[in-house]
Amino acid sequence: MDFEKKLGRLEEIVQKMEKGDLALEESLKLFEEGVKLSRECHQRLNEAESKVKLLMSVGADGQPVTTDFTSEEN
């Protein structure tokens, strides 16, 4: 499953759990799935961040440069 699908599924799980009308077993099952998806998405974001750093590692003058990739929306 790609990142976008995992994130979409995670959003579905959150919406279902926020309603508060699930049985305990179903809540636990969805929570477990959500934690797994969250970890996988976080790992993929870390990989993407590392790739951005690598791609931006050489400046216009040819000198190595490390630029941290941070979102200003956070």
Swiss-Prot record:
Chief place where the protein resides: cytoplasm
Localization: Cytoplasm
UniProt keyword terms in alphabetical order: Cytoplasm, Exonuclease, Hydrolase, Nuclease
EC assignment: 3.1.11.6
One cellular component term from this protein's GO annotations in UniProt: exodeoxyribonuclease VII complex
The UniProt record lists the keyword Cytoplasm: yes
Nuclease in keyword set: yes
A GO molecular-function annotation: exodeoxyribonuclease VII activity
Protein's GO biological process: DNA catabolic process
Reactions mediated catalytically: Exonucleolytic cleavage in either 5'- to 3'- or 3'- to 5'-direction to yield nucleoside 5'-phosphates
SUBUNIT field: Heterooligomer composed of large and small subunits.
Record-stated family: Belongs to the XseB family.
Protein purpose: Bidirectionally degrades single-stranded DNA into large acid-insoluble oligonucleotides, which are then degraded further into small acid-soluble oligonucleotides.
Record's protein name: Exodeoxyribonuclease 7 small subunit
